[in-house]
Amino acid sequence: MSHFLLELYSEEIPHGLQIDTRQNIEVLFNKKLTEYNIAFKKFSVFSTPTRLCVSIEGLPSTLSVPSKEIKGPKVGSPEQALAGFLKSNQSEQKDVFEKTIDKGNFYFVKTKKETLDLQKLFATTVPEILQSLSWKKSMRWANHSLVWGRPLKSILSLFDNHTVNFNFHHLSSSNKVYVGSVQEEKQVNIKSAGQYFQILKDKNIILDQNEREKMVLKSLSAIFKKTKSEDSPNLRLVEEVTNLVDYPTALKGSFSKDFLELPEELLHLTMMQHQRYFPMKSLETEKITNTFVTISNNKDEKKLIIDGNERVLQARLSDAKFFWDKNKRQNLVKNVSKLNGITFYKELGSLYDKTQRVRQLASLISDIIGANKGDTEIAASICKADLVTDLVGEYPELQGVIGKYFAISQGFSSEIANAISDHYLPLGPTDNVPKEKIAICVALADKLDTLIGFFGIGLKPTSSKDPFALRRAVLGIIRIIIENKLSISLKELINNAKNLYLSNNIDITNAKLADDLIEFFNDRFKNLLKDKNLRLDVVDSVLFKNRSDDFYSLFLKITTIAKYIKKPEGMNAIATYKRAKNILEQNEQIIKDTIFGNPDVVLFNSEIEETLLVKINEIKDYFTTPSRLRDSAKTIQMLSEVKLITDQFFEEVKVNDDNEDVKKNRLELLLLMCKTFDNFTDFSKFEGA
């Protein structure tokens, strides 16, 4: 069996581009292998900062291609169409034959059975694949026409011990590979795919990113264990540093303990995001220590690498401490007026205006959920005050977090301080939501104010663009409501928020604002339920029947129905509805014109008809108290109890009675029952109903 190997050697490619390109090139190669029906045993895509490698093992050396018929233009088409078809398939007029298929009479040609040399096939197809490879970010260099992630320097292409020769823009493939450092870079001849991997390994180049990741985790774990630190490295950072080195080596460094007075989040951001270092946390104290781990591309026998990293971190932390010492003395309350100088959005006023609207709306929400009104207004008033500080200007990712620490140092309560940091939450679909009542009020008010503003001036998200993160804001509101079990009328809050804009003399031009927003909320709510793997028929049954803006009640109802739908209670309720619905559908024309769900007891001629009506009225009375409908489990139980009565009803009573009045009256009874069921949820949406 044969082995194909391709290496694309370039200047260093950022880790994110490596991940995308590995996936893209795998898809393109697999598509081509499938197109030619080429079997193989193992397909691998590897990358290092400078290398992108495709390895396909267990290939045949030749490929037998059977003859096949190729459909051309319809018989009677212009001669140019037929000529183009023949040219594209390298055929002549004598090769053409006519054939009738479903869509009419067409010209066909039949290819010849042939045997392809796979080495030659790769020489043709690989340049096509490389040309179709797309990059999220790309560049041109020198005077070359090639667009690539980073300047491409060489192409190695082997089929067993033979070079697969092809040209790609200004480069020609070869059997040579670059090894050594940038300063001492040299080319080495490769005789086979097996030798390629061995030469790289001998040069401390681990081509397999999965193997490098294991090395990173193992070396981190060894240092954490030795220093009695928590062994829980950030896995995103692990993936990133894995793609930044050829041969990962973990090195431990330290910094001055004076910097430990800085907020932990600031230390984390400086080390992890800016320097790609792994902070270390003591197992004993559960606090961050003045040590860190960096992943190097080389061993550091002379301590030069770690010394350099320590100096860089010292400088960064010194800058952070300078801003911290400078800003922490600034009074948050006095900072609020400075928000007048920051525009929220050109048509929506300043951040000061936004803060005042958020304060009033949060105050209203505090009455609904029982939060401390005074503290809520204070928290909302200063929730954006840290945005005018140099520290947040330098570290914008820490907006809110910095405000929290300033608030604590200035004597505000922990609830107010937490609201400043937590009102931005959740930042993503898996982030925690605010749990304290004051933080909930400010978070809901801030997100609603943003939504009202942008929807109000017609800047709604499109299918491809959402520059103001409005989908995230909506999903955040829904999650805050559901996860904190809050029954809130969003429409009422939307109207209040709109009035606050109008009182600021900001024109809200969208006349259908509330309806548009609730529809947008419903769409995101459906997506949330889908992500939770809830049955779509259950979701549709509830949302079709309930145009509610109380998303916690809807969520409770959907999850309860989903829980009971496969239990005896749920199956009984569906079976009862289905049997009655089938009979009604058989008499659709009669029902459409004359049946409205109002049975006449005078026309009853059996006890079971009266019993069924009593039970239906009992359920209707239960439904007249809206709060009872929130107990979905009890409701399903009640609906399921009807089955015993309906079973007896269908056994003892002939619905399609010979007496037309009796028949219609029994249809009235069944329609009343179905309508009563549908008051809870639309049973017709259930699969099988």
Where are the predicted features?
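Amphipathic alpha-helical "coupling" segments that flank catalytic cores
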Residues: 1-689
